[in-house]
Amino acid sequence: MARVRIRQHVNPLSEKYRQVLACPDWATVYDDVQRPLHLDIGCARGRFPLKMAQQHPDWNFLGVEIRQPLVLEANETGDRLGLKNLHYLFGNINVEPEKFFSAFPPTLQRVSIQFPDPWFKQRHNKRRVAQPELVTAIANALPPGGEVLLQSDVEPVAQDMRDRFAENDNFVFTHDTPWLAENPLGVPTEREIACFNLQRPVYRCLLQRTP
């Protein structure tokens, strides 16, 4: 299958992306909805959830991506491989995130935000993915002990995400150092592999939902 070509950055504030994410009938996309669920926000081509689903058949994986062609391609790949613990959704996670998470199964255990679009300019801060409303929604959806993994190769972006989650009293860091040297999940994203090959640093942290 030919690789889908897409725009690198998409403005999440444009009218096209202002619809609330619609959750599927979970029983139709997963063969066992009781498995713990990992949500990967901004999954791009979905290679990370795909590899995780292959390596961890005892978990369900959900990728959310704002670029629809990538979601269509990713679901086609998952279907072709017969993975019953993997699904992708198209949409903007920051449109009424509480409503989106309220339709989740009660099995959410982990959320990851990895290498999001950086939106460097100060006036574009509202386009960044880790908005306060999303952080609150994640905190409300995760059970005690649930995890959040944050990664970026752009230090100001990583620091901004880190600060947003640190400001929420429902999260604590699992490590004493500012950044983790290694990916705690052991499965790199495509961007992470590229950074490794270029000897470019990656700034990552892992948080846990408090009781």
Swiss-Prot record:
Top-rank taxon, per record: Bacteria
Family note: Belongs to the class I-like SAM-binding methyltransferase superfamily. TrmB family.
EC number of this enzyme: 2.1.1.33
The organism of origin for this protein: Synechocystis sp. (strain ATCC 27184 / PCC 6803 / Kazusa)
HAMAP family for this protein: tRNA_methyltr_TrmB
Active site: D117
One Pfam family recorded for the sequence: Methyltransf_4
Record protein name field: tRNA (guanine-N(7)-)-methyltransferase
Record flagged with keyword Transferase: yes
Enzyme class label: transferase
Taxonomic path: Bacteria, Bacillati, Cyanobacteriota, Cyanophyceae, Synechococcales
Amino-acid positions noted as binding S-adenosyl-L-methionine in the UniProt annotation, renumbered to this chain: D40, E65, N92, D117
Recorded GO CC terms: tRNA methyltransferase complex
Keyword Methyltransferase: yes
